[in-house]
Amino acid sequence: MKKLTIVGAGWAGLSAAVAATQAGWHVALFEAAHLAGGRARSLQQNFAGQPLDNGQHLLIGAYRDTLKLMRTVGLEPDTLLHRMPLDLRYANGEGLHLPDWPMPFNLLAGLGRTQGWTLADKASLIQAAWQWQRQHFECDATWTVTRLCQETRLSPAVVTQLIEPLCLSALNTAMHEASATVFLRVLHDALLGGKGSSDLLVPRVDLGALLPNACLAWLSQHGAEIQLGTRLTADRVEALHNAASADQALLLACPPWEAARLAASISPAWADQCAQLQHTSIATVYLHCTDTHFQGLARPMLALPSSAQAPAQFVFDKGALSQQHGLLAAVVSACTTERDDISEQVQAQVREELRLTHLEVVQTVVEKRATLACTPQLDRPASFVTEGLWACGDYISGPYPSTLEGAVQSGQQVVTQLSQVTHG
């Protein structure tokens, strides 16, 4: 039987492990941490008897490979995810909210009832959307999202209340640095990917229960070897690579900086390419509203007006999604502020914007290297490292930014490539 050794049990590694098992490989999975999930995992800390996460993650309906993987390992996405049409409204009701209709009727109806936008604002978005579709959602590869907005003459209100929060949440990169090409690809799949593609899918459970735990259980049931809390040295990886053959391969499914360390002596050029990648941070500030009269937010997710001193873009009502009543999760994408400052700023921002006076900071999680800095013409590493050695992850060359769907797809695609090589 063919054997695949996978280093890393994040979403890419788990996806690859399941796909490889289905393809007839015997899988040995190693993970340095004691919990699976990588940068989308549960923490040891609890609130109201449920684990906190290392960040508040958001999926969309276009994440079809992730949803399919959930079903493969015995999960029901409709139970674990709260689905709602795209809703980027502030607490005061301003902003875009799409009804649950097919495109383009949902966009037209949503624009028609959007509060806070003038007719000129709405017309600028309709004109831009028509232009993007006419150009097949493609643009100059050197453009940033800011340049894209300038070229399509989007109004300031549309840029501030729609494009900027979408760019930050999807690419985790500031508009003036973010790749317009990748941004348009995300918009294309969300807007033209069929009914429900632009829906927001908010987890009702902790990230471990959302996918990683079920993947581990499924893999165990199907004969995989799983070793958590086991960090492989570069020497061990080199020895495994030296033993590679037509029936035995090694897959690095760890973060790019770790993959660079492990592959440095095997493929210096590939490792150097990984090491050169730039990353951006995401901060999640968990807040507890201790007001006994607090009945939750108006909606499970609210957009927040953001600035340098009020940096959070979204706040999630965990009590509306789970049993964690009174717990809020405020998210700061492309975060550049220190932990203590971000906690104070976000606490003040949520207090003022939502008129909540009894707020306590429960936990602030800053994932320093959460995603790639998704800049124009980014040179991302290939999945093929050298003979017998492969890699997968949300940083590997592909059309999408660093997302859960990108990680899942990367894991599945590398197994397809491996199978083609071994069968060839």
Positions of the model-derived regions?
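N-terminal Rossmann-like FAD-binding beta1-loop-alpha1 element of flavoenzymes
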Residues: 2-29
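Mid-domain catalytic core of redox enzymes
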Residues: 23, 230-341, 352-353
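Glycine-rich active-site loop/strand segments that organize a redox cofactor
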Residues: 38-61, 129-133
